[in-house]
Amino acid sequence: MKFIKTEISDVYIIEPSVFGDERGYFLESFNLKKFEESICPIKFVQDNESKSSKGVLRGLHFQKPPFHQAKLVRCVEGNVLDVAVDLRKGSPTYGKHISVELTGENKKQLFVPRGFAHGFSVLSKTAVFAYKVDNDYSPEYDAGIRWNDTNLNINWGLEENEVLVSEKDKVLPFWSEFDTPFNF
């Protein structure tokens, strides 16, 4: 298992070791000891999974303190473009984002720490997306930023006319309207 630092501090790409033969493959998708030695102490409290069709875009979501969440995300089947936006005021990468292609084939994972907005777009016919979170979901602390904000300039790998976004995500505030609750 490799833990790869990215250009945004505290965000990591994780590449598991995959052992395959004619029967299929085996991989260790999470190891607490290795994770904590390489990244940070963590206590995941919930695993979630979603299935989406091509063009679905979920995001950009986060939860405000005290229910802010770190996430460990992966694509079990299909192909997604996963995005994390730094919301930590005072961070040298505040307002910047990282995009990583996660696929059922490459088995990569992305660790998104607290203080980031997160989203993904589905690039394949369908995709199964799984993620761990380190804090409970709380609807009253649920928040987000508009996925197509020109200040963020995120290329989601889709044409705008093929994007399917929830009604809730269509009315999220733009970056210029956003007041971050996070500090670096």
Task: Please report, for each region that a protein language model flagged, where it lies by residue.
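Non-catalytic, conserved peripheral segments adjacent to functional cores
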Residues: 1-105, 124-126, 133-184
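Conserved SET/PR-domain catalytic core that frames the SAM/AdoMet-binding pocket
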Residues: 103-120
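Ligand-binding loop in jelly-roll beta-barrel domains
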Residues: 115-131
